[in-house]
Amino acid sequence: MRCCTEYTDRAEVSLLDYTMSQVQRLYKVYRVGRSILLDHSMRGEKMNSFFHEAVEENPIIAAVKNMDDLKICCSLEDIRVVFILFGDVCSIREIVQQIKDSGKVAMVHVDLISGLSSKEIVVDFIRKNTEADGIISTKAALIKRGKELKMFTVLRYFLLDSMAYENIRQQQHAVKPDYIEVLPGVMPKVIGKVCKMSKTSIIAGGLISDKESVMAALSAGAIAVSSTNHEVWKM
């Protein structure tokens, strides 16, 4: 472990000099060491290997806000995971299907789908009527229902003040999401603190718009970054 840590620490000094493909290879070395630590710290709780393997191949997650975004991300072979941030009760099935047809993991942000309620039944609707792999939500009750339905779950959390740290700590124990997405994702020191205190893998999202932001979040300990920026998707 010490050797792996020393290697990645040296690599991080000049990560911005590497291409994204080279960074992804270095990132995998780092993830091997971190995965071992997580396996011990999660007290026997198994990590979600399917999702985890996808972000190990490419830690950049495409967050799509409209049909143009959807078309672009589906055409990018390197993108493995897609966060769906738009849609309505009539269109969400087709949106998810396009992502699945392109061979990607489809995660629906259920809070942002028009025409659906904020109650647990919305998760049942997504599970029954789409081929979505999982859900994203800021609501603990919906995350809990997603886990009951054997879906991947991402609890989205906005870091507004210092109370957020304790709230995240409580939520991870009470709800046990598979992943926690923290926003904004451009605060590496804060991301690092959350990663150290959390037994749940962290995704950094929000305002990720360039290579420097991506590298800073990953170096701080995030398992992946989510971004709506097309240039970030193509790195």
Label for each model-derived stretch:
Residues 3-4:
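Cysteine-centered motifs
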Residues 54-60, 102-111, 149-158, 196-205:
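Short beta-strand/loop segments at the ligand-binding rim of alpha/beta enzyme cores
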Residues 64-74, 163-170, 210:
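Short, acidic/polar
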